């Protein structure tokens, strides 16, 4: 069963997908969306979910450094409920503290330009979220 990993931001959603064995995560794309309309990314996600035969979703849960859930975390929880209801697949939330910073560091070390980093940072964060989940399984 393949798993989709999502890094949900206010304007974009980074998307990653696991291999069939659940060992590795690969970046798929970054979807632009409007977080005030939870269904604005449904069409693109539907294509990915059916093309890759996804059976589960992992959504990054941004927590504050003290472990509490803030506004962004609540937004991720709302989106997780939406995904579960619309696509009828189980969703787990995964602590994503510092994944975007780690993704930024990896891209900086790869000597990627700022404009290129901006295009792939969310997809890279989704890969790190999903890979973290796969590694602990």
Curated annotation (Swiss-Prot):
Pfam families: RuvX. This is Putative pre-16S rRNA nuclease. It comes from the Bacteria. It is found in: Cytoplasm. GO terms for biological process: rRNA 5'-end processing. GO terms for cellular component: cytosol. GO terms for molecular function: nuclease activity. Could be a nuclease involved in processing of the 5'-end of pre-16S rRNA. InterPro entries: RNaseH-like_sf (IPR012337), YqgF (IPR005227), YqgF/RNaseH-like_dom (IPR006641), YqgF/RNaseH-like_dom_sf (IPR037027). CDD domains: YqgF. Keywords: Cytoplasm, Hydrolase, Nuclease, Ribosome biogenesis. Belongs to the YqgF nuclease family. PANTHER family: POLYNUCLEOTIDYL TRANSFERASE, RIBONUCLEASE H-LIKE SUPERFAMILY PROTEIN. Its EC number is 3.1.-.-.
């Amino acid at each position: 069963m393949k798993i989709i990993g999502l890094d949900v931001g206010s304007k974009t959603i980074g998307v990653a997908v696991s291999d069939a064995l659940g060992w590795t995560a690969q970046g798929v794309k970054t979807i632009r969306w409007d977080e005030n309309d939870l269904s604005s990314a449904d069409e693109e996600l539907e294509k990915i979910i059916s093309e890759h035969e996804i059976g589960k979703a992992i959504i990054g849960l941004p927590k504050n450094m003290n472990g509490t859930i803030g506004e962004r975390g609540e937004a991720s929880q709302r989106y997780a409920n939406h995904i579960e209801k619309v696509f009828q697949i189980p969703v787990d939330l995964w602590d994503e503290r510092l994944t975007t910073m780690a993704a930024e560091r990896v891209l900086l070390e790869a000597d990627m330009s700022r404009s290129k980093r901006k295009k792939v940072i969310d997809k890279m964060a989704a890969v790190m979220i999903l890979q973290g989940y796969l590694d602990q399984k």
